[in-house]
Amino acid sequence: MGLTDYCECRFSAGNGGNGIIAWRREAHYDKGGPGGGNGGNGGNVVLQADHNCDSLFFLKNKKHLFAESGGNGKPDLAHGKNGEDLVIKVPVGTTVRDLDTNQILMDFVHDQQSFILCYGGKGGKGNAAFKSPIMRAPNLYENGDKGQSLHVSLEIKYLANVGIVGFPNTGKSTLISKLSNAKPKIANYRFTTLVPVLGVVKHNDQSLVFADIPGLIENASEGSGLGHYFLRHIERCEILIHLISLDPVDHDDPCQAYEQIMRELSKYSQLLVKKKMLVVANKTDVDLDGTRFQKLAQYLENKGIPLFKISALKQELGDLVAQVFALHQKTLAQFGANKFHLPMEMEKHYVFEQASETDHDPLNIERDALGRWHVECKRLHYWFDKIPQTTLDNIRRLGNKIKEVGIEDQLKVAGAKKGDVIVFAGQEFVIND
């Protein structure tokens, strides 16, 4: 099973069950009365981070997933069954984005962290819920609310402190294998690393997670090669190690290699080039006379950038590890300990209640070429779906809701007269007064 770190899917919470009209017939209730139960609530769609989950493969071919809908109400005041929640486990490091608004909804950075992505619809009331001193035998009931539905992307961004970037075959995999217990595939050809490799590096009773990212090539940010696909995994890193090979077989000019990688990082995201970065020259064992190192060091010195030199193959790493840990501590002191969170527009948690969402929705009225008045209003749509037009009591209640919206007054202001036709929700109505 290959790495699947991105997928798109629509999730729909369960609809609320419908209330019903029923009457009590028990022997000890001689006067009977309403007995229709309420519908059950629809199940929620819940996302939960799980450290045992490391891929989105199980969602790759899922286009639409549903939570269970609530059951309808039953006689004898029986409540409909509530729908079961749909719980989806995702890897720690998963970011959830609303594809319709491009807004980040949730960023999972802790094990067992959970988030209700879609709220289930509320169950409709049965006629027993409408009983009152002035309405002892109501012929009223409601349909359940629709569950919330969202089209989202799920994207894994690994929780690594340090990301290692560079051209293919610069020695990134060798470096992480010498620093940690990671066992990446190592060979003397390009694109040996096909997926990100994580390793834990320890120093003075502290530890950091390093990530070896597949090699970048020119125009990687525009889709060339493999590395661009995995650049998302270093968005959370506090520090980047920019590894440059001194072997002339790998690049003609190490200075040009530095600039090309920096351009690709910049084109992908300005956040990457603003991160703390250590530029490291590798394969010093090949640069026997040191001319390539001196050329690169002078070039970077003119930019005010220090250059470290190592030979990962010979484990000549100098004080690189100490420098990385010192820079990490400095970064934490500057930016705080909430290190793995991505910048979010807002951490939005939905509270789904359809009626309240539509209370302040504007009423739009337009007249067509036939003289009919077309009315659009989310709040009115909500009540047309909510109140079935099957009993006189329900029709009267719907009429009251229409008056509350103020549709009659606004139609008069627009110039509507008695006998004009109103078109709403696919139905036509005639103005009688």
Curated annotation (Swiss-Prot):
UniProt keyword list: Cytoplasm, GTP-binding, Hydrolase, Magnesium, Metal-binding, Nucleotide-binding
Residue ranges of domain OBG-type G in the record: 160-329
Reported cofactor(s): Mg(2+)
GO biological process, one term: ribosome biogenesis
The protein's Enzyme Commission number: 3.6.5.-
All residue ranges annotated as the Obg domain in the record: 1-159
Entry keyword Cell membrane: no
Domain annotation OCT: ranges: 355-433
Residues annotated to bind GTP: 166-173, 191-195, 212-215, 282-285, 310-312
InterPro entries named among the record's database cross-references: G_OBG, GTP-bd, GTP-bd_Obg/CgtA, GTP-bd_prot_GTP1/OBG_C_sf, GTP1-OBG_CS, GTP1_OBG_dom, GTP1_OBG_dom_sf, OBG_GTPase
PROSITE patterns, alphabetized: G_OBG, GTP1_OBG, OBG, OCT
Residue sites binding Mg(2+) per the record: 173, 193
First-tier enzyme category under EC: hydrolase
Chief localization: cytoplasm
GO cellular component, one term: cytoplasm
GO molecular function: GTP binding; GTPase activity; magnesium ion binding
Cellular localisation: Cytoplasm
Keyword Cytoplasm: yes
Top-level lineage group: Bacteria
NCBIfam families: Obg_CgtA, Obg_CgtA_exten, PRK12297.1, PRK12299.1
Role: An essential GTPase which binds GTP, GDP and possibly (p)ppGpp with moderate affinity, with high nucleotide exchange rates and a fairly low GTP hydrolysis rate. Plays a role in control of the cell cycle, stress response, ribosome biogenesis and in those bacteria that undergo differentiation, in morphogenesis control.
Assembly: Monomer.
PANTHER family reported in the protein's UniProt record: DEVELOPMENTALLY REGULATED GTP-BINDING PROTEIN-RELATED, MITOCHONDRIAL RIBOSOME-ASSOCIATED GTPASE 2
Family: Belongs to the TRAFAC class OBG-HflX-like GTPase superfamily. OBG GTPase family.
Protein name from the UniProt record: GTPase Obg
Organism of origin: Mycoplasma pneumoniae (strain ATCC 29342 / M129 / Subtype 1) (Mycoplasmoides pneumoniae)
